[in-house]
Amino acid sequence: MVDAFCATWKLTDSQNFDEYMKALGVGFATRQVGNVTKPTVIISQEGGKVVIRTQCTFKNTEINFQLGEEFEETSIDDRNCKSVVRLDGDKLIHVQKWDGKETNCTREIKDGKMVVTLTFGDIVAVRCYEKA
């Protein structure tokens, strides 16, 4: 089912992302850049692993992992996390844990778009991507 996510995606809409970044402790200047940047996300499968590349003018990141297996990740805002990504039905759920905290990133395909819901505590941000 990961195949449905394998594509190049361009951000088209973002809601409440500044509040989400603020809750994570991201500084003002970085949040300003994050709010205007429209990243491209490339999801693929390579050698039995899922690869998610995020490209933007601010910073490029890449994670590769096997579904359901914990891996070390440095987030785009430089948090050192222990992460797990799993497939739950038609949703790709990415959980990051660091310093006793946890955030969830749920990716799902709706009407040909990738909808990404970011949750940290009671703060929810939604970012929508279309195929590039």
Swiss-Prot record:
A fatty acid binds at residues 127-129. Expressed in brain and other neural tissues. GO terms for biological process: cell proliferation in forebrain; neurogenesis; prepulse inhibition; startle response. Coiled coil: none annotated. The keyword Transport applies. InterPro entries: Calycin, Fatty_acid-bd, ILBP, Lipocln_cytosolic_FA-bd_dom. It is found in: Cytoplasm. One of its GO terms (molecular function) is fatty acid binding. Pfam families: Lipocalin. The modification N-acetylvaline is found at residue 2. PROSITE patterns: FABP. GO terms for cellular component: cell periphery; cell projection; cell-cell junction; cytosol; neuronal cell body. The keyword Secreted does not apply. Keywords: Acetylation, Cytoplasm, Lipid-binding, Transport. Its main location: cytoplasm. Belongs to the calycin superfamily. Fatty-acid binding protein (FABP) family. B-FABP could be involved in the transport of a so far unknown hydrophobic ligand with potential morphogenic activity during CNS development. It is required for the establishment of the radial glial fiber system in developing brain, a system that is necessary for the migration of immature neurons to establish cortical layers. Forms a beta-barrel structure that accommodates hydrophobic ligands in its interior. This is Fatty acid-binding protein, brain. The lineage of its organism: Eukaryota, Metazoa, Chordata, Craniata, Vertebrata. The gene is Fabp7.
